[in-house]
Amino acid sequence: MEDPVFTFGLIADVQYADIEDGENYLRTRRRYYRGSADLLRDAVLQWRRERVQCVVQLGDIIDGHNRRRDASDRALDTVMAELDACSVDVHHVWGNHEFYNFSRPSLLSSRLNSAQRTGTDTGSDLIGDDIYAYEFSPAPNFRFVLLDAYDLSVIGREEESEKHTHSWRILTQHNHNLQDLNLPPVSVGLEQRFVKFNGGFSEQQLQWLDAVLTLSDHKQERVLIFSHLPVHPCAADPICLAWNHEAVLSVLRSHQSVLCFIAGHDHDGGRCTDSSGAQHITLEGVIETPPHSHAFATAYLYEDRMVMKGRGRVEDLTITYS
């Protein structure tokens, strides 16, 4: 049987907290805060059996409730201990709950900054510019790109910063619920995305992404892009999309090297094929997964296809390429 070129694990929205089960912000979904660590442990055990070579954690590793209980560090220690059992590099994407718990400077100096865990083929990054985005080649002919979806945001930037001011302007231009900007400005449609718990990508980050993909085009690489926020309207609920998702899609559609864009944030998950042929995958969230189920995946990269084996709520998926 053919061996894959590279194998890696995928998981999203663990949102662990040592508290009783509860509900989401809109009180429409059940959340299993304490049990999420058990599901993470099960995922790690399976990845060990499958001998994955790295794991990509798509953001929201602990829940914002921890900050209010002064338990952020303790909760992070709990989930990191589970991930340490993988014995492989874990690449962390940052979501809104990372910023509920920690400031950007704190995150950059924490274990959730995985930019240096890129093996022998270290690529470029924007860490020095205070943007948590980096890329590397996990195996010949493949490239991973991790994006900072809260580069533009009011929760991911210090209040005195220019980016916070710019982000506030964007948000309040579209959302007039000034008493609670986590409430969407409309009840249906793409404008729902302009909420405080979302964010976007700066022009600098988009230019960097374009340059990375241009080089991958020339090298004939297959590129997998990871972000907490999804960018395709057909792969997620509109309320979960990045503010400037169209700008990201414009960049992606101009490069033949893009294989797929993998995100979290929408706990229901989603899948679609873009007009360019790129796949958009939104992984189901652990936090809203009942204790008797699972929500993670193992992805196998071959020379001609990517096979994603889902567990529990995550469905299998195969992407073929030539």
From Swiss-Prot:
Pfam families: Metallophos (PF00149). Zn(2+) 2 binds at residues 60, 96, 228, 265. GO terms for molecular function: 2',3'-cyclic-nucleotide 2'-phosphodiesterase activity; ADP-ribose diphosphatase activity; CDP-glycerol diphosphatase activity; manganese ion binding. Zn(2+) 1 binds at residues 13, 15, 60, 267. Its cofactor is Mg(2+). Gene3D superfamilies: 3.60.21.10. Its EC number is 3.6.1.13, 3.6.1.16, 3.6.1.53. It is an enzyme of class 3 (hydrolase). PANTHER family: MANGANESE-DEPENDENT ADP-RIBOSE_CDP-ALCOHOL DIPHOSPHATASE, PTHR16509. This is Manganese-dependent ADP-ribose/CDP-alcohol diphosphatase. The lineage of its organism: Eukaryota, Metazoa, Chordata, Craniata, Vertebrata.
